[in-house]
């Protein structure tokens, strides 16, 4: 095609005056790759008849290359605005950290630290000692250990306590926790032999006792936090399982999952057990997450009897799943807030969002609406409507949190157009579409998000 003759050669483009600033700003190999990519895209558009002569001029080509370089060199992991109303959104990074944790992270990240150095003795120390004390203080457990996530915590515990031996678990608790990641798979990987008992909806103490053999090493309870079985149901409580285990000299382990340290039943009207309840029930080993209801960084926390955690601390697998210094700093900073429950509810974003009342959210939504309306063109229309938020993170799946939503419409744009545009902004804004309307939930929009939200909404104006 004649139009293809207008596409400049790579060498010619590299010699253009307009490219000098890009060559000064980026490594030459990166610029060359962007030039080739841009010219190839231009060729494809020309073949589809989607371009004109001006696109081949120096100004147009250089502009395309500059945009390509900006995209290529932008950080892939970036901040965004969570307007979905899902508080512990796994795909959006789960729990945002408390502001007070920022200083702790800065100090540890940009300098040396006593990660594995005992300042009192002047010799090598343990990275796990920095948080073990406060975890035991908050939960009432004898000992604690932290790894990089809860799946790793379960894997380490099972590998240490039950490799090559039987682990008995209720059939109704063989959960999948997301991403096709299933408890039976973790058990097999640990070397433990899965022995399921009971029915999907009903399991009794006699089901466990009838399955115990000389090869049984552990009784396992898994908290079903991401689904609910209702109707004709029965389950064995942690206390009942502990009594059964002691009668057979078997340890009991519980995967609590969401890691709740605050009594939420009075605040949210739900029944989500706390880690402390499992400790008081006498459960020997308990595992839970750091970045769900606890509101901290991704981590797996193991608490329980000292005699059972001691071999985990010396297990070869611990090295593979150990926690890093930044996560330790963030976790310690978050846990310290729990020493004052009122402060924790106020300063830990996850807890603050979850416990915000409908009246508070109505006031927040109205104030945010006024602020947005003052800053965006009239072609972008905003309105309020009642709705519900979700907890997310595989916790409290049946709980609906009343909220006030902000509906967004724009002239000439469908809800899908709005979603795509906002998602493509420098600071992406993620909302949800319901019944053909794009919605933002103020519950999960942080104060610092508002300038970026305004800038994103301004791009909808036409």
Curated annotation (Swiss-Prot):
Compartment(s) of residence: Cytoplasm
Top-level division of the source organism's lineage: Bacteria
Protein family per UniProt: Belongs to the SelA family.
Described purpose of this protein according to its UniProt entry: Converts seryl-tRNA(Sec) to selenocysteinyl-tRNA(Sec) required for selenoprotein biosynthesis.
Enzyme Commission number(s): 2.9.1.1
Cellular component, GO, one term: cytoplasm
Listed GO MF terms: L-seryl-tRNA(Sec) selenium transferase activity
Xref: InterPro entries: PyrdxlP-dep_Trfase (IPR015424), PyrdxlP-dep_Trfase_major (IPR015421), SelA-like (IPR018319), SelA_trans (IPR004534), SelA_trans_N_dom (IPR025862)
Annotated keywords: Cytoplasm, Protein biosynthesis, Pyridoxal phosphate, Selenium, Transferase
Residue positions where N6-(pyridoxal phosphate)lysine is found in the record: 292
Pfam families assigned to the protein according to its UniProt record, in alphabetical order: Se-cys_synth_N, SelA
Keyword check for Transferase: yes
Gene3D superfamilies: 3.90.1150.180, Type I PLP-dependent aspartate aminotransferase-like (Major domain)
Gene: selA
Protein name listed in UniProt: L-seryl-tRNA(Sec) selenium transferase
PANTHER family, sorted: L-SERYL-TRNA(SEC) SELENIUM TRANSFERASE
GO-annotated biological processes: conversion of seryl-tRNAsec to selenocys-tRNAsec; selenocysteine incorporation
Disulfide bridges in this chain: none
């Amino acid at each position: 095609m004649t139009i293809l003759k207008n596409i400049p050669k790579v060498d010619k483009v590299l010699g253009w005056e307009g490219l000098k600033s890009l060559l000064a700003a980026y490594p030459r190999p990166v610029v060359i790759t962007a030039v080739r990519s841009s010219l190839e895209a231009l060729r494809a558009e020309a073949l589809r008849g989607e371009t004109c002569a001006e696109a081949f001029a120096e100004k147009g080509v250089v502009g395309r290359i500059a945009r390509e370089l900006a995209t290529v060199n932008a950080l892939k992991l970036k901040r965004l605005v969570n307007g979905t109303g899902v508080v512990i959104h796994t795909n959006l990074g789960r729990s945002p950290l408390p502001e007070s944790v920022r200083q702790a992270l800065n100090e540890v990240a940009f300098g040396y630290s006593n990660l594995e150095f005992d300042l009192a003795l002047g010799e090598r120390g343990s990275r796990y000692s920095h948080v073990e004390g406060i975890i035991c203080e908050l939960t009432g457990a004898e000992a604690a250990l932290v790894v990089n996530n809860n799946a790793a915590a379960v894997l380490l515990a099972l590998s240490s306590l039950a490799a090559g031996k039987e682990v008995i678990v209720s059939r109704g608790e063989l959960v999948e926790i997301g991403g096709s990641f299933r408890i039976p798979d973790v058990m097999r990987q640990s070397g433990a032999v899965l022995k399921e008992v009971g029915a999907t909806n009903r399991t009794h103490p006699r089901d466990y006792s009838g399955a115990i053999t000389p090869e049984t090493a552990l009784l396992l309870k898994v908290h079903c936090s991401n689904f609910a079985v209702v109707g004709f149901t029965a389950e064995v409580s942690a206390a009942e399982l502990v009594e059964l285990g002691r009668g057979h000299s078997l340890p009991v382990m519980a995967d609590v999952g969401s890691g709740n340290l605050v009594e939420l039943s009075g605040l949210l009207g739900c029944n989500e057990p706390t880690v402390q309840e499992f400790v008081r029930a006498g459960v020997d080993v308990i595992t839970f997450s750091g970045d769900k209801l606890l509101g901290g960084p991704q981590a797996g926390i193991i608490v329980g009897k000292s005699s059972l955690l001691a071999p985990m601390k010396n297990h070869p697998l611990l090295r593979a799943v150990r926690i890093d210094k930044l996560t330790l700093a963030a976790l310690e900073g978050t846990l310290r807030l729990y020493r004052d429950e009122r402060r924790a509810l106020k300063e830990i974003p996850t807890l603050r969002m979850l416990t915000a009342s409908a009246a508070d959210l109505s006031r927040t939504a109205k104030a945010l609406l006024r602020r947005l309306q003052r800053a965006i063109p009239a072609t972008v229309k905003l309105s309020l409507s009642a709705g519900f938020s979700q907890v997310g993170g595989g916790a409290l799946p049946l709980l609906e949190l009343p909220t006030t939503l902000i509906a967004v419409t724009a002239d000439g744009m469908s809800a899908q157009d709005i979603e795509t545009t906002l998602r493509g902004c420098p600071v992406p804004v993620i909302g949800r579409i319901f019944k053909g309307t794009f919605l933002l939930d103020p519950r999960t929009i942080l104060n610092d998000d508002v300038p970026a939200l305004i800038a994103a909404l301004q791009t909808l104006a036409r």
